UniProtKB/Swiss-Prot annotation:
Region annotation Disordered: where it falls in the sequence: 726-758
Ranges of Basic and acidic residues composition bias in the record: 726-741
Domain of life: Eukaryota
Name assigned to this protein: pH-response regulator protein RIM20
Self-association state and partner proteins as the record states: Interacts with RIM101 by binding to its two YPX[LI] motifs.
GO cellular component terms, semicolon-separated: endosome
Family, similarity comment: Belongs to the palA/RIM20 family.
Gene3D superfamilies: alix/aip1 in complex with the ypdl late domain (1.20.120.560), alix/aip1 like domains (1.25.40.280)
Record-annotated BRO1 domain positions: 3-398
One Pfam family, short name: BRO1
CDD domains the UniProt entry points to: BRO1_ScRim20-like, V_AnPalA_UmRIM20_like
Role noted for this protein: Required for the proteolytic cleavage of the transcription factor RIM101 in response to alkaline ambient pH. May act as a scaffold protein that recruits the calpain-like protease RIM13 via VPS32 to its substrate RIM101.
Species annotation: Yarrowia lipolytica (strain CLIB 122 / E 150)
Length: 773
C-alpha cells in the first residue's frame, strides 16, 4: 500500500440537460429551445461522459471538455437554472455518501468538476511508478496540477458558492487537500534528490519544507468537518517524520564537517520530533503499513547513529553537545507551486475545433442581457412609483389642508343651504361605482389573511430552528467536550439575524394594519351613507335657512370657489399625467438598443466575450434620462399647489370672518365636512390597503425562501452531527480496544480513507529511501 494519499472522486447522478437547459432557455431566457437542439444533445452527452470516473487520460479529456464548456455556459445562463438539479455526493467524511448536496447552480456543478479534476490528477500522481527519477518527475507534476485545480476552486469557485451547498467543498477542506498535494509533490522532489545523491544539507532543507507543507495541510484538516481522523493521523506522522529526516540529514552534514557535538544534538532532535505526537500506540493503529514502516525505519537508523555518535564523542572527540533548542533553524527549500493545466486556467480560450471543441450555445442571448432588461424595467418602476408617490402626497396634503380649513363644507352650506352639494354627489357616485364599502371590507380581510399566513409560515420556520437547537443541546450534553462544533446560534447566525428582521417586519406591519383598521372603523358609518345614495344623503344632511348674504360674502364666495376649482384642476391634471406616464412606460422598449450595443461589443472584442451587467449600464443609464422631465414636472406640482393653498387659506379666513351663521347652518356645515373628511380618508386608506396586500405578498415570498433555507440548514447540521458522532464513536471504540487488552501490535493498521480504488497503485518499498532519511 502506498505511503501517500490520493483524493477520492466526488460522485454524481445523471441529469437530463436536454430538458433542464431547454426549459431554462424557454422560461428564464425567453428564447426558443428548437434553435439549440443540437447543442442540447451535445451538452447532455458531455455530462454523461463524466458519470463513471476513472484515473486515466480518457476521463481527464472528458472532464476537461465538459469543464471548459460549463465555464462558457455560465456566461450565458442564469446562476440558478430553475429546471435543473445537480446532485453530488461527498467522499471524504465518514457519512460522505449518506445524502447528496443538491443545487440548481451551474457554478456548483463547475466547482464539483474542479474538485474531481484535482482528484484525478492526485490519483494519476499516485499511480505513477516512483522508483526512478522519471516516475518521480511525473508524480511531482501531477500533484502540482492537482494543487492547481484546488487553488482555482479556492480563488474562482468557493467565493461565489452558495453557503448551503458547501458540504464537502468547505474552504478549510479544499485548502487542506491543496496543501496535501503540495506536500506530496515536495516529497517527490525530495525523493529525487536522494536518487541523485544531493548533499545532506540540501536534502535536509527539502525535507524541512515537506514537513512544513504537511503541517499546513494538517492545520486546515483540523478545522474541516470533512477530513477523517485517519488522514489527520497520517499527516501528523508525515509532518514529524520529515522533521526528523531534516534533523537526521543535518546530523550527517555535521558528521561530514567534523562537528560531532552538533551531530549528537541533531540526532536527539530527530528522535524528539518522532516522539512528539507520533509515539502513541493509538496513532499508529491509524497508519497504513508503509507509513508505519517508514516511521520505524527512521527511528532505527537515528537510534543506531546516536549510539555510535555518543560513544565516539565520549571516547575520541570530546566535543560539547549543544542543547537542541540552541540549534540553528533549518532553512526550508520550497520547490513546488500550484500549477493548474492551462486548459483549466483559461478554459474558454481553448474552446476551438482542434482543442476542446467549439463552444455550445454561441447564439444564445446572454443572461446578462436579460438582467439588463429586468434591471431597466425595475429602475423605471422605481422612477414612476416615486413620481406617483409625489403626486399622491400632493393630493393628501391638499385633503389635509381642506380638512383644517373646514372646506368645502362651509362654502357648500352657504352656496346650497338645502339639498346635496355637487361634490358630495360626485363622491357618492364614485364610491358606489367602486363598491367602496364592500371592497374596503374585503381588502381588510385579505390583508388579515395574508398577515396570518405570513405569521404561520414564519412560526413554522422558527420551529425548525428551535427543534435543531434543542437537538444540538441534547447532543452537546451527551458528548460533553467532544462535541466541538459551533452551537446552533453561531452556526446559523445569518438565519437567526434574518428571523429577527422578519419578525420585526411583521410587528411593524401589524401596527400599521391596526391603524388602518381604526381609521376605517371611524368612517364606516359615513361611508355607508355615501355608499347608500341620495336618499341616505338627504336624510343625513340637515337643511339651513337661507339668509341674506352680506356684500363681503357675496364677493368672497365665487373667489373661494375658484380657488377650490383650481385645486381640483391640479388634481385632475396630476391624474391625467400619471395615465400618460404609465403609457409611456408601457411603450418603453429598449431591447433593440441593448441588442445593438451587445452586438457592437462582440464585434469589437471576440465571440467568447463574457458579458456582464456592467457592460450594459452606460446604455440603461442614458435611456433612463428620458424620465428626468417627468421627475421635474412632479416636483413643480408641489410648488404650484402650495401657491394655491396659501391663497385659499387667506381667502377662507376672510370668508369665515364675514359669516354670520346660525345653529342650523353650523350643523349643515359640520355634516357636509364630515362626509368630505370620510371621503378623503377612504381614498387614503384604500391606498394603504393596496400597499398592505403588496407588502404581505412580497414578504410571504421572502419568508418561504427563509423557511426553505432553515430546512436546508437543519439538514446540513444533521449530516454534520452524524459525522461527528460517528467519529467520536470510532475514537471511543479504538480507545476501549487499546485499553482493554487488545494490544496486538501485529494487527493490521487502519488504512487511509478512500471512496474508490485507484488502479495500478505502486508500492513504496524501503529501497525508495524514505525509511533511511
Amino acid at each position: 500500500m502506498p505511503n501517500i494519499i490520493w483524493i477520492p472522486f466526488r460522485e454524481t447522478q445523471a441529469v437530463d440537460l436536454i430538458t433542464g437547459l431547454g426549459d431554462t432557455i424557454e422560461k428564464q431566457l425567453n428564447q426558443p429551445r428548437d434553435k439549440f437542439t443540437a447543442d442540447l444533445k451535445t451538452a447532455n452527452d458531455l455530462r454523461n461522459n463524466i458519470l463513471n470516473p476513472q484515473p486515466n487520460a480518457s476521463y481527464l479529456d472528458h472532464l476537461t471538455k465538459y469543464y471548459a464548456q460549463l465555464t462558457y455556459w455560465t456566461t450565458k445562463f442564469p446562476a440558478g437554472c430553475d429546471s435543473l438539479e445537480f446532485m453530488w455526493y461527498g467522499t471524504l467524511a465518514y457519512t460522505a455518501n449518506a445524502a447528496p448536496v443538491i443545487s440548481q447552480s451551474l457554478h456548483f456543478e463547475r466547482c464539483n468538476l474542479l474538485y474531481n479534476l484535482g482528484s484525478l490528477y492526485s490519483q494519476m500522481g499516485v499511480n505513477e511508478g516512483r522508483q526512478d527519477a522519471d516516475g518521480l518527475k511525473m508524480s511531482f507534476n501531477y500533484f502540482q496540477m492537482a494543487a492547481g485545480c484546488f487553488q482555482i476552486l479556492i480563488e474562482n469557485g468557493l467565493p461565489d458558492l452558495e453557503s448551503l451547498n458547501m458540504r464537502g467543498l468547505e474552504y478549510d477542506t479544499i485548502c487542506c487537500v491543496r496543501d496535501l498535494m503540495l506536500a506530496q509533490a515536495q516529497e517527490c522532489f525530495w525523493q529525487r534528490s536522494l536518487l541523485s545523491g544531493s548533499r545532506n544539507s540540501l536534502v535536509a532543507k527539502l525535507a524541512q519544507q515537506v514537513s512544513l507543507l504537511y503541517d499546513s495541510a494538517l492545520a486546515w484538516a483540523q478545522k474541516s468537518p470533512q477530513v477523517r481522523s485517519e488522514w489527520v493521523h497520517h499527516m501528523t506522522c508525515k509532518r514529524q517524520h520529515f522533521l526528523a529526516v531534516a534533523h537526521y540529514r543535518m546530523a550527517r552534514d555535521a558528521l561530514d564537517g567534523c562537528r560531532y557535538g552538533e551531530e549528537i544534538a541533531r540526532l536527539k532532535a530527530a528522535l524528539n520530533a518522532i516522539k512528539e505526537g507520533t509515539g502513541k500506540g493509538m496513532l499508529r493503529r491509524y497508519l497504513v503499513e508503509s507509513v508505519a514502516d517508514d516511521l520505524n525505519g527512521i527511528i532505527d537508523v537515528v537510534t543506531e547513529d546516536l549510539k555510535r555518535a555518543e560513544k565516539d564523542n565520549n571516547l575520541i572527540y570530546l566535543q560539547s553537545v549543544p542543547q537542541t533548542t540552541a540549534l540553528a533553524p533549518i532553512t526550508p527549500a520550497l520547490m513546488v507551486k500550484c500549477t493548474p493545466p492551462v486548459e483549466l486556467a483559461k478554459p474558454i480560450e481553448f474552446l476551438t475545433k482542434d482543442k476542446l471543441g467549439l463552444p455550445l450555445f454561441v447564439k444564445l442571448t446572454p443572461f446578462a442581457f436579460h438582467q439588463a432588461l429586468v434591471l431597466y424595467s425595475q429602475e423605471c418602476d422605481k422612477i414612476v412609483s416615486s413620481i406617483e408617490s409625489q403626486l399622491k402626497n400632493c393630493t393628501n396634503s391638499k385633503n389635509q389642508a381642506l380638512v383644517e380649513m373646514a372646506l368645502p363644507g362651509s362654502l357648500d352650506s352657504v352656496e346650497k343651504p338645502k339639498g346635496i352639494p355637487a361634490d358630495i354627489i360626485a363622491h357618492s357616485d364614485q364610491i358606489k361605482s367602486e363598491r367602496g364599502l364592500e371592497t374596503t371590507r374585503e381588502a381588510v380581510k385579505d390583508v388579515q389573511r395574508l398577515a396570518a399566513t405570513a405569521r404561520q409560515e414564519l412560526e413554522a420556520a422558527k420551529a425548525v430552528l428551535d427543534d435543531e437547537r434543542s437537538e444540538d443541546e441534547m447532543l452537546r450534553r451527551k458528548n460533553n467536550s467532544g462535541w466541538t462544533r459551533f452551537d446552533s446560534k453561531e452556526a446559523g447566525a445569518h438565519l437567526y439575524t434574518r428571523l429577527a428582521e422578519l419578525e420585526q417586519y411583521l410587528a411593524d406591519a401589524g401596527a400599521s394594519d391596526k391603524l388602518v383598521r381604526g381609521k376605517l372603523d371611524e368612517i364606516d358609518y359615513l361611508l355607508s351613507i355615501l355608499n347608500s345614495g341620495r336618499s341616505a344623503l338627504e336624510n343625513y344632511l340637515p337643511s339651513s335657512v337661507s339668509g341674506v348674504r352680506s356684500p363681503e360674502v357675496k364677493r368672497q364666495v365665487p373667489h373661494l370657489r375658484d380657488l377650490l376649482n383650481n385645486l381640483e384642476s391640479l388634481e385632475i391634471k396630476r391624474a391625467q399625467y400619471m395615465d400618460r406616464l404609465s403609457l409611456k412606460q408601457q411603450n418603453d422598449d429598449i431591447e433593440p438598443v441593448l441588442e445593438y450595443h451587445m452586438n457592437k461589443l462582440i464585434r469589437e472584442k471576440h465571440a467568447n466575450l463574457r458579458l456582464t451587467l456592467a457592460d450594459f449600464e452606460p446604455i440603461t443609464s442614458k435611456e433612463l434620462e428620458k424620465y428626468t422631465v417627468d421627475q421635474d414636472w412632479a416636483s413643480e406640482q408641489k410648488e404650484l399647489q402650495e401657491e394655491v393653498l396659501e391663497k385659499l387659506d387667506v381667502a377662507n379666513k376672510d370668508f369665515r370672518s364675514s359669516l354670520d351663521m346660525n345653529d342650523a347652518a353650523i350643523h349643515r356645515e359640520n355634516a357636509i365636512q364630515s362626509l368630505e373628511v370620510a371621503y378623503f380618508s377612504y381614498q387614503e386608506q384604500k391606498d394603504h390597503l393596496d400597499a398592505g396586500r403588496n407588502f404581505y405578498n412580497q414578504l410571504l415570498g421572502e419568508i418561504s425562501i427563509f423557511h426553505k433555507n432553515c430546512k436546508q440548514f437543519v439538514y446540513e447540521r444533521k449530516m454534520e452531527g452524524a459525522s461527528l458522532e460517528h467519529e467520536l464513536s470510532s475514537m471511543h471504540l479504538s480507545e476501549h480496544e487499546h485499553s482493554g487488552g487488545h494490544s496486538d501490535t501485529s494487527s493490521t493498521p487502519l488504512a487511509a480513507p478512500r471512496a474508490q480504488r485507484a488502479s495500478n497503485l505502486s508500492m513504496w518499498s524501503p529501497e525508495d529511501g524514505i525509511r533511511f532519511g
